[in-house]
Amino acid sequence: MRYSKIVSLGAYRGERDVYNDELIGPINSSDEWIRRRTGIISRKRALSGTTVVDMAYAASKEALNDAQMRPEDIDLILVATITHFGHTPSVAAHVGFRIGVQDAILLDINAACAGFSYAIFQADLMIKSGVASRALVIGVDKLSEFIDPLDRTISFLLADGAGAAILVGSTSMGIGKTVCGGNPGQLESVGLTGSTTDVKSGSAWPTLRQEGSSIFRWAVWQMAKVAKQILDINQVQPGDLNAFIPHQANIRIIDELAKQIGLEENVLIAQDICKTGNTSSASIPLAMHSLIKGNPSLSGELALQIGFGAGLVYAGQTVVMP
């Protein structure tokens, strides 16, 4: 049977380090409160002229170089994003043009903070089916474009970044079975205050908002159940895992999820949020990139990754670290 695996990673983090002290005035808060509630010390934000295409391209170049691949080797580009203002052509098409892909499947998807896990799922299926052989999967978002500095629910979490992974065919399973789904009954729990088209009729520029307490409960209790489903369907025990890479929503969610899943003390848990912030579609690949750069011995080891966000939607799978 044909499988797929991740062979390389690439990352782009915003050029600016934005510390809590820069944000606390408008929300009448403190550095201590933000650290305690979210774990964030600073977050990465891009310069005003930097686009999601620029960010995705930068991450892609590192992934290609790390895999020692040529652009013409890639026959599938999948991009997960919620912040592509250009809409069409897709970010995938723009990245393909910039890196010099000759002929490839080019596709963007929108699944918010679960987007990268959905994209890995799709790339894995396409490689298994023989439709593609080498895939470039990217998660990228520039959330700083949707910040209300007066908002106390989510503004201080938001950051900018891009993470890329290259998948190839494999004789052994490198991407496990995926569990994914959604609960649209909680559609209003997190999202934009309006649409960009509303601006044409005089409405204010949309910004992100969330119902923090309901998101926390859903992320911890429901995603713990989903994580256990992922392990069960892949016949993996918590003790088999070497790493846990959840969406970098906030540190309290990450810690509580790990506790509910029953992870053992030796499992390395991604905490990229502390100095990168919440980058939505990019958070899982950035967290994986950071984790493996700091712990090279994780290469070839088993990780559980799970994304969850606006919709409310979720997706996750086990992966062998590149």
Curated annotation (Swiss-Prot):
Annotated metabolic or biological route of this protein: Lipid metabolism; fatty acid biosynthesis
Record keywords, A-Z: Acyltransferase, Cytoplasm, Fatty acid biosynthesis, Fatty acid metabolism, Lipid biosynthesis, Lipid metabolism, Multifunctional enzyme, Transferase
GO BP: fatty acid biosynthetic process
EC number: 2.3.1.180
Domain of life: Bacteria
Keyword Cytoplasm recorded: yes
Transmembrane segments: none
Pfam families: ACP_syn_III, ACP_syn_III_C
Sections of the chain in a coiled coil: none
CDD domains: KAS_III (cd00830)
Region (ACP-binding): 248-252
InterPro entries linked to this entry: ACP_syn_III_C, ACP_syn_III_N, Thiolase-like
Cellular localisation: Cytoplasm
Cross-referenced SUPFAM superfamilies: Thiolase-like (SSF53901)
Catalytic reactions on record: malonyl-[ACP] + acetyl-CoA + H(+) = 3-oxobutanoyl-[ACP] + CO2 + CoA
GO cellular component, one term: cytoplasm
UniProt cross-references to Gene3D superfamilies, sorted A to Z: 3.40.47.10
GO molecular function, one term: beta-ketoacyl-acyl-carrier-protein synthase III activity
Active-site residues from the entry: C113, H247, N278
Family per record: Belongs to the thiolase-like superfamily. FabH family.
Assembly description: Homodimer.
Function comment: Catalyzes the condensation reaction of fatty acid synthesis by the addition to an acyl acceptor of two carbons from malonyl-ACP. Catalyzes the first condensation reaction which initiates fatty acid synthesis and may therefore play a role in governing the total rate of fatty acid production. Possesses both acetoacetyl-ACP synthase and acetyl transacylase activities. Its substrate specificity determines the biosynthesis of branched-chain and/or straight-chain of fatty acids.
PANTHER family (alphabetical): 3-OXOACYL-[ACYL-CARRIER-PROTEIN] SYNTHASE (PTHR43091), BETA-KETOACYL-[ACYL-CARRIER-PROTEIN] SYNTHASE III, CHLOROPLASTIC (PTHR43091:SF1)
UniProt note: domains: The last Arg residue of the ACP-binding site is essential for the weak association between ACP/AcpP and FabH.
Protein name: Beta-ketoacyl-[acyl-carrier-protein] synthase III
Species annotation: Tropheryma whipplei (strain Twist) (Whipple's bacillus)
